[in-house]
């Protein structure tokens, strides 16, 4: 079994969630969860989120539990979406790391998470105070 903590466009009902189930006859298991020690940000346009380590903050998301077969099909697609190359991990938009998360049923487990990489650090950002992409403030209006 492999776990993935999603906090943005990969969460159920969001634009990229279908990637979690491509190429598999069965669906992974989904549970609401929290990751401590992270802050959630949106790029300036508000089109995508990213997480960074930040003591004292937490983010809400979904813990997705895959079978080994499901993960072998899903993770290359997810790495491509997130601009993560395991052969060159510091070169993309995101880094894939293991992080301790807690489900709403109080189960604690390690899960893969995509954290902001060095390329994202160069973009203007906005803190999502709620720590929940689904409850974020509206994007700023551009004139």
Language-model regions: role of each:
Residues 1-143:
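Glycine-aromatic micro-motifs
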């Amino acid at each position: 079994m492999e776990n993935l903590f999603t906090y943005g466009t990969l969460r159920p009902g969001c634009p990229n969630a279908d990637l979690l189930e491509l190429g598999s006859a069965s669906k992974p298991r989904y549970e609401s969860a929290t990751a401590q020690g992270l802050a959630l940000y949106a790029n300036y346009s508000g089109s995508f989120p990213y997480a960074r380590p930040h003591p004292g903050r937490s983010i809400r998301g979904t813990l997705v539990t895959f079978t080994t077969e499901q993960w072998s099909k899903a993770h290359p697609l997810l790495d491509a979406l997130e601009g993560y190359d395991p052969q060159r991990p510091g070169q993309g938009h995101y880094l894939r790391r293991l992080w301790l998360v807690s489900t709403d049923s109080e189960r604690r487990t390690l899960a893969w998470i995509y954290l902001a990489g060095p390329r994202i650090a160069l973009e203007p950002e906005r803190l999502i105070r709620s720590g929940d992409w689904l409850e974020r403030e509206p994007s700023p209006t551009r004139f």
